[in-house]
């Protein structure tokens, strides 16, 4: 539902077209979800059918991680799979801090989800910056200087998820994702809370308004709560 609210409810037609392109150019799961959203908007199907179509694909590709029926799955695994850049794979390489010697390495493990460790402190923006470029344990074969791990996306990035399980970090309104040519600024669009197989979310629109959604209490609608910046960080990180 959060992806649907991002795609359709909070913004206008032009933004829907942008999200359509983002979904279709990401992977089969988001492309299928987009098709389901379009059918719902035209009154030809339901949001539940859109969800079930993606769930069937997930189960077919990995029945262990994504079981059918009423059995739950890992939220982290679900997010990783849903956002994995199947068509636009990022580049991961090691670069020497002294002679700039570069080694390309397997980038299949680089997705659009960053896990924030329990020991992390600072803002999400700072943590993400360190994640995208940090010191490795290896040294350069040419000059024995330390090698830095650098992640760069082949195209300007449009969607990224962060898994925050600790409250010692500060949620950032914007973050920067480095591309091959330039960095792209991404704005915080939503927060998902989960526990006991129940999900709620907060959507942040382009004006910084926070909208709350809970399928049990708000049904198919979202309610406007506050402005981003007026809600304390502890309250933002809990629901």
Specify the residue positions occupied by each region the protein language model found.
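UBL (ubiquitin/ubiquitin-like) substrate-recognition surfaces
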Residues: 1-239
